[in-house]
């Protein structure tokens, strides 16, 4: 008579075995009930001062075909039930073990009035989006810098080119070398040779 | 001393640039909505008629003007008549407003794109509450996708008055969006011409991939049937016609000066009539194509939600009446409901308010447009697909391409008149001019990354361009037909391209299109006046839904300023020219 719906310290449990396991669903019978009692007793034994809890101290009642039922945990004298707070914390601490025993999860094995602790989402120290952002940001910055620099370089060459003879061109190249602080004569020479053909064409088309 | 104007490398680049500009987010998130609102398949009738009588002629007109005058909007209209230079200025001002807020969409697309590389997708689950026993309250009341949009992305404030500060995450994304735009426009047509190959074609690749995926999704046919079932009675609805005309008008991007700018880089002999027809047809075709994709995904989403709803009801009944698990199915649900209602009337009536009414029809009826469609509804569909990360990345990549493609046109509309002006371009290189424009826009755009930024975004989106554009294009057509002279323009075109202009275009330019625009203008103006106080939708965190609020006085002032600052350019510039000429004549008279 300690175990009845709505009784003090009694908890309702709901299982959705078919939803969770589909064709592999097992039938809910007395053996499963025994396992359930064992799991509850196991959880209770971990609570301080309740190490003596036996399987027979867990009482089930009102088992429906849903499968749902009520349960209480009694003290060794079997005269009164253990306080709800203790049962609650015991179940919460071991919810994962209980779930695994029945191949169920928080949604398909519900202890009404005992909210299960949800797994916190993975929280990496550096958010993923900022990493991707950083990569793309750097690529864009480099591309812009390259385009601008090449634009400036092209313009310099073009400005110098019309001002006659090779002398002037040499001078220009010297200037570049000095400005960059890198002796890059061979590179410039090479560039000059290749681009010669395009220069006149560019000049005709691109305004400044 | 005239410098040679830079040209497109080939006419394909020009067509791609126009397509990339015209095909924008409106095709993806506005057209499907209009289809849904105005009779599904039957909306195509007004849409196609408006395309032929309004879209094509006006597009042709703008391209022809650009190609003939070979200048950006300001210069082109000044050449036609000095009194009209205000039209060009107004175009530039509107483009400036547009690019200011438009790039915020790209920033959001970047933000969602970056967050797509996670498992699970951050908008598929609600964050946990403080003690880890349930989910965040606001998220529970709304939905995980709404929560991610309003709280994580916008961190929206409860009203326009509470500004909040600039938030660094969206601000960074906006900065990135502007850098990307700057990279694309840095070298003028030279670089834009190459970028448009990607921005114009990649969205189609993604759309095709999505079409294949969409059609194979469970429930896609529900959405497609919904879209293609014509509701003929909507043809008698004048709003359907007005919306069709408006959609064509804005989706082609008329009046911004972008098309004039693009066409100004054409060879004068270019056959722009052909290009106008191609671009407008492709634009409309894309809208229809995108709707098919959208509706197949819509169907999937609606079916998914409908089945979820049924499952929830089944679970509720199973739990309350302790029915056997798995006994209730979608097919016997109604029957069992009836049985339970008669067997346990009191218990049933007690829980009856909790039973949701599941209906596929009403799921399909919820029409959403704009950012709500892209960032809330689409993400909701994506999160339920398999390999959702892949689809999410593809989708937001497509949005980015569409957005950046349109941005290229918007910035060209600002930059071409600036680089055309001798005073500016003689002092500053092209890179510096475009850099400055991007910088200024980005700095002002930071307003939209504040907590109240989305409300300002709505203000700009609703009021910055609508009326001004109608007025600008109206003045443009009148200017060409009656100021410059239709005959003269016709002979110019003939000399340029070597083809006579067909009577059809002339009738449309001189009569039908201006009348259409005037009627649209009158409709919108009276609509604004009749609605009385302007309202906006604010997010209420405690209810987890949108509530309607009145705009505060200063917001109304900003709206007024937005409209006035662009439209007033036209009369002011005309007045200025008039005064200038008077003064000149006054100076000249005594000497003579």
From Swiss-Prot, chain B:
Record topology, Extracellular segments: 27-42, 101-165, 216-241, 298-389, 453-465, 526-554
Subcellular location, record wording: Apical cell membrane
Keyword Transmembrane helix included in the entry's annotation: yes
Keyword hit for Transport: yes
Membrane topology, Cytoplasmic segments: 1-5, 64-79, 187-194, 263-276, 411-431, 487-504, 576-592
Catalyzed reactions per annotation: L-proline(out) + chloride(out) + 2 Na(+)(out) = L-proline(in) + chloride(in) + 2 Na(+)(in); L-pipecolate(out) + chloride(out) + 2 Na(+)(out) = L-pipecolate(in) + chloride(in) + 2 Na(+)(in); sarcosine(out) + chloride(out) + 2 Na(+)(out) = sarcosine(in) + chloride(in) + 2 Na(+)(in); N-methyl-L-proline(out) + chloride(out) + 2 Na(+)(out) = N-methyl-L-proline(in) + chloride(in) + 2 Na(+)(in)
CDD domains reported for this sequence: SLC6sbd_SIT1
Membrane-spanning segments: 6-26, 43-63, 80-100, 166-186, 195-215, 242-262, 277-297, 390-410, 432-452, 466-486, 505-525, 555-575
Source organism superkingdom: Eukaryota
Record keywords: Amino-acid transport, Cell membrane, Glycoprotein, Membrane, Symport, Transmembrane, Transmembrane helix, Transport
Tissue expression pattern: Kidney and small intestine. Expressed in the S3 segment of the proximal tubule. Expressed in neurons.
Pfam family, one: SNF
Molecular function GO labels: amino acid transmembrane transporter activity; amino-acid betaine transmembrane transporter activity; L-isoleucine transmembrane transporter activity; L-proline transmembrane transporter activity; neutral L-amino acid transmembrane transporter activity; proline:sodium symporter activity; solute:sodium symporter activity
PANTHER family according to UniProt: SODIUM- AND CHLORIDE-DEPENDENT TRANSPORTER XTRP3 (PTHR11616:SF44), SODIUM/CHLORIDE DEPENDENT TRANSPORTER (PTHR11616)
Disorder named in the UniProt entry: Hyperglycinuria: A condition characterized by excess of glycine in the urine. In some cases it is associated with renal colic and renal oxalate stones.
The protein, known as: Sodium- and chloride-dependent transporter XTRP3
């Amino acid at each position: 008579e300690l175990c009845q719906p709505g009784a003090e310290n009694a908890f309702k449990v709901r299982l959705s075995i078919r939803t969770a396991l589909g064709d592999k669903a097992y039938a809910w019978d007395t053996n499963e009930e025994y396992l359930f009692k064992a799991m509850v007793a196991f959880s209770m034994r971990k609570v301080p001062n309740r190490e003596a809890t036996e399987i027979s101290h867990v009482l089930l009642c009102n088992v429906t075909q849903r499968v749902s039922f009520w349960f209480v945990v009694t003290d060794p004298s079997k005269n009164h039930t253990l306080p709800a707070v203790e049962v609650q914390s015991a179940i919460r601490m071991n919810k994962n073990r209980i779930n695994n025993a029945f191949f169920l999860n928080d949604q398909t094995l519900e202890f009404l009035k005992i909210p299960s602790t949800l797994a916190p989402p993975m929280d990496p120290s550096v958010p993923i989006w900022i990493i991707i952002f950083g990569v793309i940001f750097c690529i864009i910055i480099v591309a812009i810098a390259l385009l601008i620099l090449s634009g400036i370089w092209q313009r310099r060459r073009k400005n110098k080119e019309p001002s006659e003879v090779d002398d002037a061109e040499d001078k220009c190249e010297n200037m570049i070398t000095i400005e960059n602080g890198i002796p890059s004569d061979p590179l410039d020479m090479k560039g000059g040779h290749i681009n010669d053909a395009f220069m006149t064409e560019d000049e005709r088309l691109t305004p400044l | 001393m005239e410098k040679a104007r830079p040209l497109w490398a080939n006419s394909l680049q020009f067509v791609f640039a126009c397509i990339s500009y015209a095909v924008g987010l409106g095709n993806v998130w506005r057209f499907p909505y209009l289809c849904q609102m105005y009779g599904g398949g039957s909306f195509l009738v007004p849409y196609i008629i408006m395309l032929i009588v309004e879209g094509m002629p006006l597009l042709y007109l703008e391209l022809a003007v650009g190609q003939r005058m070979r200048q950006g909007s300001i210069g082109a209209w000044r050449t036609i008549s000095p009194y009209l230079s205000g039209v060009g200025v107004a175009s530039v001002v509107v483009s400036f407003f547009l690019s200011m807020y438009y790039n915020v969409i790209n920033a959001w697309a970047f933000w969602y794109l970056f967050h797509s590389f996670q498992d699970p997708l951050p908008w598929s689950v609600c964050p946990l509450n403080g003690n880890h026993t349930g989910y965040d309250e606001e998220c529970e009341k709304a939905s995980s996708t709404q929560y991610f949009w309003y709280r994580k992305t916008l961190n929206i404030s409860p009203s326009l008055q509470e500004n909040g500060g600039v938030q660094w995450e969206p601000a960074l994304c906006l900065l990135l969006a502007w850098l990307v735009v700057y990279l694309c426009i840095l070298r003028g047509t030279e670089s834009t011409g190459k970028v448009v190959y990607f921005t114009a074609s990649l969205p189609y690749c993604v759309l095709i991939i999505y079409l294949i995926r969409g059609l194979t999704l469970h429930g896609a046919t529900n959405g497609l049937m919904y879209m293609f079932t014509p509701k003929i009675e909507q043809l008698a609805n004048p709003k359907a016609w007005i919306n069709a005309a408006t959609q064509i008008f804005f989706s082609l991007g008329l009046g911004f000066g972008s098309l004039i700018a693009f066409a100004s880089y054409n060879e004068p002999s270019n056959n722009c009539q052909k290009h106008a027809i191609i671009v407008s047809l492709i634009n409309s075709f894309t809208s229809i194509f995108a709707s098919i994709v959208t509706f197949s995904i819509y169907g999937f989403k609606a079916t998914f939600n409908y089945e979820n709803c049924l499952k929830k009801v089944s679970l509720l009944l199973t739990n309350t009446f302790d029915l056997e698990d798995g006994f209730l199915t979608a097919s016997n649900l109604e029957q069992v409901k009836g049985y339970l209602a008669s067997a346990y009337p009191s218990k049933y009536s007690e829980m009856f308010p909790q039973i949701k009414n599941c209906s596929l029809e009403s799921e399909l009826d919820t029409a959403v447009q704009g950012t709500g469609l892209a960032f809330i509804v689409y993400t909701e569909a994506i999160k339920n697909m398999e390999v959702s990360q892949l689809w999410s990345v593809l989708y937001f990549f497509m949005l980015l391409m569409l957005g950046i493609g349109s941005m290229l046109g918007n910035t060209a509309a600002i930059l071409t008149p600036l680089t055309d002006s001798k005073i500016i371009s003689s002092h500053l290189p092209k890179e510096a001019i475009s850099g400055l424009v991007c910088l200024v826009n980005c700095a002002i755009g930071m307003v939209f990354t504040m907590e109240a930024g989305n409300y300002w975004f709505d203000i700009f989106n609703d009021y910055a361009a609508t009326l001004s554009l109608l007025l600008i294009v109206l003045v443009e057509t009148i200017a060409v037909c009656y100021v410059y002279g239709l005959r003269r323009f016709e002979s110019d075109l003939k000399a340029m391209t070597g083809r006579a202009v067909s009577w059809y275009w002339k009738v449309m330019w001189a009569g039908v299109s201006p009348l259409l625009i005037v009627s649209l203008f009158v409709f919108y103006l009276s609509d604004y006046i009749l609605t009385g106080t302007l309202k906006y939708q604010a997010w209420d965190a405690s209810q987890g839904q949108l509530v309607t609020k009145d705009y505060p006085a200063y917001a109304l002032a900003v709206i007024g300023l937005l409209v006035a600052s662009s439209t007033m350019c036209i009369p002011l510039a005309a007045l200025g020219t008039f005064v200038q000429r008077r003064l000149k004549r006054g100076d000249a008279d005594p000497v003579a």
